[in-house]
Structures are given as C-alpha cells and as structure tokens.
Amino acid sequence: MDYKLLLDTAVMSGEILLESGAETWRVEDTMLRMLRMSGLKTADVLALTTGFVVTLDDPAMDSMTVMRSVESRATDLNRIHAVNQLSRDFCEGNIDLDALFHRVRDIYRAKSEIKKNLLAMMATTAGFAIMFGAGFYEVLASALAGFISGIGVYGGKKAGMQSFLVNCIGSFLLAVTSILCVHYLPGTMDLNVIIIASIMPLVPGVAITNAVYDTLHGDYISGAARMLEAFVTAAAIAIGVGLGMLLLRPLVR
C-alpha cells in the first residue's frame, strides 16, 4: 500500500469534513478508520475546530506527520455524507485506495453552486414564513430578503471577509430588504415575521448542535470553541439587523 497516498487521502477527507461543519470526533473517526487500513502500528489524529494533526508511524518506516489548518467553515451535509460513505466503502473493501483518492479529490475540488444555494435560501425563508403564519406578500418578502441576504453572504465570502463581517452584511441586507418590502409592497405585513423568517438560514443551529456533540464525546476544547463560534455568529446577526433597522428607522412601522 502507498502510505503517502493514504495519508494524503485522509488529510483531504479531514479538511473537507471540517470545512463542511462536521463534528471534530467525526473527523477524527473517519480519518482514523482510513489510516488503520494501512496495518501500521501507529495511526493518530488530533482534530480541533480550526485544523488537525495526523501521524502514521511504524518501526519498519520513517514516521509521517501532517498538520493542516482550516480557515473557512460552512455547513454542507452533502459533502460530509459523501466523504463518510467513501470511507465506509474503502474500509469494507468495496473500493481501492486509488479510487478513494480520486473520488475524495473530486469532492475537494468541487465548487459550491451559487444558484442552488440562493434558491435554497429563498425556499428556506419562505418556508419558515409560512410556518410562522405569514400571508402571501410576507412570504414573498421573506423569500426576496433571503435571496438578497444570500447574495451578500456569497459576495462577502468571495471577497475573503471574516465570517463575522459576512454574517453582519447578510443580516443587514435582509433587514433593509424586509423594511423596504413592508413599506412599498401592498397590504399590511408583519415586519417581525419577515425578519425572523429571513434570518433562519444564518442562525448557527449546526454549530450549537456540534458543540453539544463534541462536549458529550469528551472534546471540551472543540465543544467550547463551537459554542463561542455560535455566540459570535448570533451577535453578528443581531448587529446587522439592528444596523439595518436603525438606518431605515423612519420607514419602520
């Protein structure tokens, strides 16, 4: 077996999982299962929310250690599922190492589709608006606010901004859009319902869930870090919405 190729594959898999919002225990477990297929004496992984260290060692060879920093994080359950499934197939012997490497590399290189993401943002915000008892124009306003917010978030990430600023921009745009819709669209609309429905895609629910999972698995550092990340994200959303309402205060009714 090509141990270097196996290590590179495990590192790519771990990076994909961390970037996609997977729990740190899942990252460690997935990488360890791959590395233990080597049959070497030592295979260790230490994963945190911002990176990981992985080592392969055996008396018959020189040890190999890789440290990787992960700066960008988002939520992409499809990528997490795809990597986990490939890991299972590899450990069960359904695919060989070369096939595993190329499939993981394809996932690693694949770019997110902005059109699908924006449509998902619109559908999510509209769905929450309906759940909160919104009328037709309120649902329409929520979908539009989600669309504009999604463009702002995508543009901020594309420009390399920090996640705090990205969330501030997204929530600011959705607040401004919601207020303008309430002011200019016909009928009586509830601004609170529109804003609450529109911020749902930005709410750090996955980060909070992962914080609980990591803590229950004994990874207190990652659990505390993810909880702090969720708090900072929530603060950014509140600041963005507050600034938007402050800017258009004369139109708020």
Q: Which residues are covered by each model-predicted region?
A:
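Soluble N-terminal domains of membrane-associated systems
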Residues: 1-95
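Alpha-helical transmembrane segments and their cytosolic membrane-interface
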Residues: 72-125, 129-138, 229-238, 249
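C-terminal ends of transmembrane helices
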Residues: 102-103, 149-162, 207-222
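Core alpha-helical transmembrane segments of integral membrane proteins
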Residues: 111-186
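Generic detector of multi-pass transmembrane helix bundles and their immediately adjacent loops
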Residues: 183-253
